[in-house]
Amino acid sequence: MLHIPPENVWIALAVTLAAGLATAIGSLLVLFSRRPNPRLLAFGLAFAGGAMVYVSLSEILNKSIASFALAYGERTGFTYGTLAFLLGVIVIVLIDHFIPNPHDSLDKQDPAFRENSREYLKRVALLTSIAITAHNFPEGLATFFATLESPSVGMPLAFAIAIHNIPEGIAIAVPVYFATQNKFYAFSASLLSGLAEPVGAALGYWLLSGSLSHATFGWVFGLIAGVMVFLALDELLPAAKRYAKGHETVYGLVAGMGTLAISLVLFKW
């Protein structure tokens, strides 16, 4: 079993908490501005998607393979790392199948934005909150374990997830605010959803802390990489394209990848 210094656990948990709290920023943008800028949302979503794809394929998947290689040898390690990645994709596909896409309610043309449909708004608010909270659990695990094993990987990943959490905060706050006309309720709903990330991280560590090994990290990192890549390709990039008026999606995608590439190089130094 690997020994993890207690201070590393607290650092990883703090980073995960900071990423989760970004949902509250999204709610504040709704409550204290006229309307979210759709082109900025498009760029931000694509930026987060590019960052998550890059760090998942260039760092997290490689760490899965390296961890398995330390446990079982190079050839077996590569095989297990690939299987863990594919298993992560399958897991998030199943979650996505049963829980609706949390970005659907951001559309200003959706009936949820009509002030005379309070009951519909309440239903949208509830479903959106549940959806985003469920998606935040694996994101919390990803941030926590990536930071726990390597802050140089965890910090950029947390940054990407934080950016992606801002529009999720908007997705929660908008229907809650229109349904209740209460800013506190809208802010609280977004905040509580974001707190699912550190809660998921704490639960994951509690379950796995007694059996942390190279093989355990291999499975965790492989699953994380699969989950993050699927979320980026299935949710973030399509949502970005939905709000884009021009080339914001491509610019955001390239900027996200470039920013993560540079930050990872800087962390190496």
Curated annotation (Swiss-Prot):
Keywords: Cell inner membrane, Cell membrane, Ion transport, Iron, Membrane, Metal-binding, Transmembrane, Transmembrane helix, Transport, Zinc, Zinc transport. GO terms for molecular function: metal ion binding; zinc ion transmembrane transporter activity. The keyword Transmembrane helix applies. Fe(2+) binds at residues 136, 139, 165, 168, 197. GO terms for cellular component: plasma membrane. It catalyses: Zn(2+)(in) = Zn(2+)(out). Coiled coil: none annotated. Belongs to the ZIP transporter (TC 2.A.5) family. ZupT subfamily. Mediates zinc uptake. May also transport other divalent cations. This is Zinc transporter ZupT. It comes from Stenotrophomonas maltophilia (strain R551-3). The gene is zupT.
